[in-house]
Amino acid sequence: MQSKWTPYPWVCFSMCVGVMGTALASPLYPIYQQAWGLQPSHITQIFVAYMFGALASLLFLGRLTDRFGFLAVLRAGLVLMTLGITSSALAWNVPSFAICRFVIGVASGLITTSASVGMTQLNNKGDLQRAAATTSLTIAFGFGLGPVVGGLMAQWLPMPLKTAYLPSILLGFLAIYALFQVRIPASTSTSTGGLSFRDVMPALSQPRRPFLRHYML
């Protein structure tokens, strides 16, 4: 039986929600600074925690998409992202918030890599330029939407350090539910065997030439 949930738009939606979650906290730092008495060094630590999580995810978890398929990794990334954002709303000091940002960084790497692969594989026309353009636009839209939503929620609602995260949490649950409803063609599923040590070893490789060319436009 064919699923009514078309995979391609929901993969795009999931990437947008994931990227939105990474940028949501940007307009909240002045409020954190007033509430917690943050120093510039504290903000640096929070940014470093996020970047360390994102880089670690890209270096050590990038192969998981090849092993388990993009859909499984995208689901895991969104669950982790939603968990990190929910925890951010409950954070009470700099160390707890930095841990949340680290988790969000790891989830960001999983989401962007798996969703990019998914949009390429689900593109029926095999148009790499279209897939690359869609990926770029989705990422840009998510990065722009996050601060706008977070800023508006913080401006007009009480308890801004909690309520600002609600849209991202709700959209995250919607994306997770949708990804568990979609069905992808068997040819796009690459889940074979279990996890090995080699799957989490850093690997640097050059993208396929057409993909590289289109991303450099």
List where the protein language model places each region:
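Juxtamembrane helix-start elements in MFS-like secondary transporters
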Residues: 7, 39-47, 132, 136
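Helix-loop-helix hairpin linking two adjacent transmembrane segments in secondary transporters
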Residues: 125-183
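Extracytoplasmic
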Residues: 6-40, 112
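Paired small-residue
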Residues: 84-87, 95-104
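Helix-breaking motifs and short loop linkers at transmembrane-helix boundaries and internal kinks
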Residues: 37, 69, 90-96, 158
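Cytoplasmic helix-loop-helix junction between adjacent transmembrane helices
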Residues: 100-139
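Flexible cytoplasmic inter-helical loops of multi-pass small-molecule transporters
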Residues: 183-203
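Central cavity-lining transmembrane alpha-helices of secondary-active solute carriers
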Residues: 45-63, 112, 116
